[in-house]
Amino acid sequence: MFPSLTSDPERPQLPDRDFESSISTSNADLDDLMLSTNGAPDGKLNGRAPSGTSNVTGESYAAAAAAAAAEANERDGKEDPNNGEKRYADAVADTDVDNTGRHDQWSYPELPITAHPKSIKTGSWRAGGIRFAPLRVPMRRRLQTAAVLFHCMSIATFVSAFWLICANPLAWPIIIIYLIHLALSTAGTNGNLTYRSEWVRSLKLWKLFTGYFPMKLHKTHELPTDRKYILGYHPHGIISHGAFAAFGTNALGFRELFPGITNTLLTLDSNFRLPFYRDYIMLHGLQSVSKESIWNLLSKGGPSNDGRGRAVTIVVGGARESLEAQPGSLRLILKSRKGFVKMALRTGADLVPVIGFGENDLYDQLSPKTHPLVHRIQMIFLKVFKFTVPALHGRGVLNYDVGLMPYRRPVNIVIGRPIRVDKAHGPQPGQQDIDELHERYVQEIEKLWDAYKDQFAADRKAELEIFA
């Protein structure tokens, strides 16, 4: 998750966004900005609705509903050519149609203006072409930087602590017992969540972490507690900071937005073999992304001990997609990713699309198109070791141009409409059912992007691209 990194001397500059004035500011300006949250009056977004919202009047809704009812009556009067049996996609569509009566009339709701940076004067200074932060910066912003630094260095910190303890012979008996436990433990896959600590997930540290960017979690639809869910998070970004903040902590208010839903963020199984670090991530409720883990999480637990009221979050694009993380773009690896769809059909879990607008803006990295040799080496490394090493850089702790810290750029995580899965389809769902549900999921991702791209990706350089 935290590979060795290299810097790009010709990195592209992406200005940070001011949604209120549409005036861009530099990274140096942003580090000394105080954040404010402005609500949109009367539910309007500065006089314009996000892309994808509908302007249909009440009369046209009534006419559409009447037409849909007449069409339904006419359809019911005809004999079903399939002898009463419907394809999976048709059956789900019948139960998932909006109250308007038609899919194409449905649109995502408006969302309020979120926290965004204000433009003020800064006192940064330059030396050797590097912009350094001024000495007089509010203490809260220093603490935010420290929180992000701790998270970015967590693997190195905990693994180094383990080796430091190993240097003491008096600790060897305890270390041997711990390593045996580490090798035999199934805590990362058994679905019991016994290590999960709501106290750790609610630490003030994580409020500071999310305030650094800042981040905000947006809800568009309810998630009933009598269902189970698989949330697909897009894009992967470099380190998936947004996914961790939203679903690995309580800092963004997921449990308040969706009371009664226990959400579990999934990560690579190899992370549960790192001493001390595996205990750290399990305290935050993280579990393995293996099939066994997903099955256990969604088949037991919850009020009825059958998985209802539980959710898992999968960063679908994986390490391969991290190599495509470029500021101002959203390139997704989704066409070939159908394993999570198959698990949704196996467990009867609804699919929920999630987009982290701004996730790709947090770092700069070498582009595969302009540096094909570096990209080939990265792909070989990914194939052999199952994780990748992005050639990236960000800002530093005390400067704005050199370092491995993410930039202070807003991240807005929008949870979309759940796609209902009517029932569990057994251990081997049909390929046609998998393809049809996957197609619906891709369509919902595109609709979610279109609905909020003008609000949360106003400075984008390219549109959504699903290329693999």
Question: Residue locations for each model-derived region?
Answer:
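Catalytic cores of transferase enzymes with a strong primary signal for eukaryotic protein kinases
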Residues: 281, 407, 446, 450, ...
